[in-house]
């Protein structure tokens, strides 16, 4: 009984152990399968991630390679453009250098011509001095001859008295005339003889006096020229502006040259940029435009912001400053000469002469000099000194605006002085100082003499510069005479004319016709060396302000 009980327990225990072992094995197998599944899934996930990452890396490599190729292409394009810009800049530099060299050669030639003229004047003065010495010797000899003739005449008179006495005795003996009648006859004969001798002496003395008067007149003129001599600086057609560094040249030129084109169009002055370190050159025959351009460029350099709108603003400011300086120059001239009560508009026109030259001579300085000379001579002669000074100062007032108004500077000056109620004698002196009308007073004669002394003194004037300016003025006048032309500037020393037209009056098609018409008139009416380029510019702007 007991054995039967034990057996089932053992069996149960064995079964339990077997079941436990089988359960463990089954659990292990299941867990192993799960682990293997998870490991496979993890491996597949890792492989997928690695494949995705590898694909992304390949894409990134492709993009980087594409970007690298694009960068290489951009670099090659930049190098090509850089080389082209360098070649273009070098070409422009060569052109500017050639222009500057041509200008320097022209100035050297002009200086050589001036030196030759000065040498000729010195030779002429030496020759005149030698002639004066010879004339003085001749006068000394003539004086000795006159003295000898006087002694001879005295001897003849004594001889005549002796003859008279003999004739008296003879007449008394022959005609039995009384002494008084005989004396009358003899005196009449002697008087006729002495009259002839006296006439010869008078003619000789008149010739001598005339020669001495000429010599004294020459001496007076020389003294007047020496007393009126003033320091004179030769006028030029260029101004030099200093730069803080050479990098500023590129900013002045601007992108594709737009800044330099805007500057030249707004000022009418040629801006020359060459390889001269830290400097640029402004070239133009109109001194007022050149001064405006110089001040505007200096302001732009100081400000640092250089673009077309800023250029236009600075040019307007510089033009206002120059206009103020012109008025101050007129007032200074009046104060220097002690002239009062002149119309302000006439004072402003007078100040413009500061920037006007005639044959290379500054017209304002020349006018002040003429006023001083005329006043000095009027005071010496007891005439109205203040009126003479006023007439001398205003005698060339027409030259201030003769580029803008039709007519000679004399006609313009007469019209201006009448308009602003100057005295009639002043108006007549202006009208008569070139012999166009009769002189009504000695004041007009004094103005002519003072004008001659001031303009004729050595080194005062240079004809070549005046001819050059006249040619450029005529060139601008031809270009500006057409309807629709707003402004016309002669630049490049007269080798180019830039014509600004009004877009509302002239179309794009018409500017070509206008350029050819201007060319034909220039070829027909002007004499000039080389070629002249006619450039017609039509620009239309649209401006809107956002608030």
Curated annotation (Swiss-Prot):
Residues in HD domain copies: 363-456
Annotated GO biological process: mRNA catabolic process
Any one of the GO CC terms: plasma membrane
TM segment ranges: 6-26
SUPFAM superfamilies reported in the protein's UniProt record: Eukaryotic type KH-domain (KH-domain type I), HD-domain/PDEase-like
Protein localization: Cell membrane
Domain KH: 237-300
Function: Endoribonuclease that initiates mRNA decay.
Protein name: Ribonuclease Y
UniProt source species: Lactobacillus delbrueckii subsp. bulgaricus (strain ATCC 11842 / DSM 20081 / BCRC 10696 / JCM 1002 / NBRC 13953 / NCIMB 11778 / NCTC 12712 / WDCM 00102 / Lb 14)
Name of the gene: rny
């Amino acid at each position: 009984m007991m054995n039967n009980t034990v057996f089932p327990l053992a069996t149960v225990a064995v079964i339990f152990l077997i079941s436990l072992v089988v359960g463990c094995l089954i659990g292990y197998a299941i867990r192993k399968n799960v682990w293997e599944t998870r490991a496979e899934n993890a491996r597949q996930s890792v492989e997928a991630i690695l494949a995705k990452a590898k694909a992304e890396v390949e894409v990134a490599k492709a993009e980087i390679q594409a970007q690298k190729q694009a960068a290489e292409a951009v670099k090659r394009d930049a190098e090509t453009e850089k080389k082209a810009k360098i070649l273009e800049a070098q070409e422009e530099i060569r052109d500017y250098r050639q222009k500057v060299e041509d200008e320097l050669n022209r100035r050297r030639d002009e200086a050589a011509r001036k030196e030759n003229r000065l040498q000729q004047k010195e030779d002429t003065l030496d020759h005149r001095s030698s002639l004066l010495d010879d004339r003085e010797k001749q006068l000394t000899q003539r004086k000795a001859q006159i003295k000898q003739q006087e002694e001879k005449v005295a001897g003849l008179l004594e001889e005549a008295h002796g003859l008279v006495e003999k004739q008296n005795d003879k007449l008394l003996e022959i005609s039995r005339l009384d002494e008084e009648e005989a004396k009358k006859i003899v005196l009449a004969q002697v008087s006729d003889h002495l009259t002839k001798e006296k006439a010869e002496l008078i003619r000789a003395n008149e010739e001598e006096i005339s020669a001495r008067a000429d010599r004294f007149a020459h001496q007076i003129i020389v003294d007047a020229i020496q007393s009126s001599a003033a320091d004179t600086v030769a006028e030029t057609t260029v101004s030099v502006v200093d730069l803080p560094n050479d990098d500023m040249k590129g900013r002045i030129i601007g992108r594709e040259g737009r800044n330099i084109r805007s500057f030249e169009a707004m000022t009418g002055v040629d801006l020359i940029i060459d390889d001269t370190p830290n400097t640029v050159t402004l070239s133009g025959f109109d001194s007022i435009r050149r001064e405006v351009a110089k001040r505007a460029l200096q302001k732009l350099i100081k400000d640092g912001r250089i673009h077309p709108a800023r250029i236009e603003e600075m040019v307007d400011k510089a033009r206002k400053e120059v206009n103020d300086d012109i008025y101050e120059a007129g007032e200074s001239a009046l104060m220097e000469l002690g002239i009062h009560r002149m119309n302000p508009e006439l004072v402003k026109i007078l100040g413009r002469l500061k920037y006007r030259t005639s044959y290379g001579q500054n017209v304002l300085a020349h006018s002040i000099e003429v006023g001083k000379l005329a006043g000095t001579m009027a005071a010496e002669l007891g005439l109205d000194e203040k009126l003479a000074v006023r007439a001398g100062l205003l005698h060339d007032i027409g030259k201030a605006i003769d580029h803008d108004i039709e007519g000679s500077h004399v006609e313009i000056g007469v019209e201006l002085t009448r308009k602003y109620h100057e005295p009639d004698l002043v108006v007549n002196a202006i009208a008569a100082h070139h012999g166009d009308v009769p002189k009504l007073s000695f004041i007009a004669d004094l103005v002519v003499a003072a004008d001659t002394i001031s303009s004729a003194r050595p080194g005062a004037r240079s004809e070549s510069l005046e001819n050059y300016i006249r040619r450029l003025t005529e060139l601008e006048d031809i270009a500006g005479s057409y309807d629709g032309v707003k402004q016309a500037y002669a630049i490049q020393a007269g080798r180019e004319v830039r014509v600004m037209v009004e877009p509302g009056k002239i179309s794009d098609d018409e500017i070509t016709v206008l350029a050819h018409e201007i060319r034909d008139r220039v070829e027909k009416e002007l004499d000039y060396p080389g070629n002249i380029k006619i450039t017609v510019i039509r620009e239309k702007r649209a401006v809107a302000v956002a608030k």
